[in-house]
Swiss-Prot record:
The lineage of its organism: Eukaryota, Fungi, Dikarya, Ascomycota, Saccharomycotina. GO terms for cellular component: cytosolic large ribosomal subunit. Pfam families: Ribosomal_L2, Ribosomal_L2_C. This is Large ribosomal subunit protein uL2. The keyword rRNA-binding applies.
Amino acid sequence: MGRVIRNQRKGAGSIFTSHTRLRQGAAKLRTLDYAERHGYIRGVVKQIVHDAGRGAPLAKVVFRDPYKYKLREEIFIANEGVHTGQFIYAGKKASLNVGNVLPLGSVPEGTIVSNVEEKPGDRGALARASGNYVIIIGHNPDENKTRVRLPSGAKKIISSDARGVIGVIAGGGRTDKPLLKAGRAFHKYKLKRNSWPKTRGVAMNPVDHPHGGGNHQHIGKASTISRGAVSGQKAGLIAARRTGLLRGSQKTQD
């Protein structure tokens, strides 16, 4: 009988430790308040910082509290073109400039926005990775809905009251540059999650993995495996509907 394979060990679980020691904090929009719903509020970018484990830089924006005599620092995901000392306007009546936060209903069609809320007040959920953005396709004022195109190409209908930041998330093209060295991959995943390095099953011995063994590296049997297989057999293409290359291109539905 073979050894317990990797996915069985993972499934057994362990004490979880999050890799968040060097992180700056949760990157969110301001809490939706009266000032943003009916007018605008002004903040200033104090600092642009690197966030460990994240591809995009963060901007620390200071707003004056609308109710108390104090300043509040918010952490935004920095957009391309945002700089320290820049004024950030957030609200329904804010101007259409890069870095400003507006409800989607106040933004013209064809505008590029990022860190968009899925539901009004959730403080940002869509298009948050480096170089990502959402395109406004159209508005339906009768139903107070806005149609957007997500970074995946999918179309989505969300409330026109959901907010977004004008512009593209900074750090675009980051993935075009190869890591080149194992050391860089080591440091990258040290701050993300315990998923590196990954040994291929065909590189193992037969005792360690269903694909292991042989005089040269090959799987040696069909890599599709049934959904009802026991856990030690579940390696490869589990319950695959189809395998092989996709023929032709798949268009996203309008």
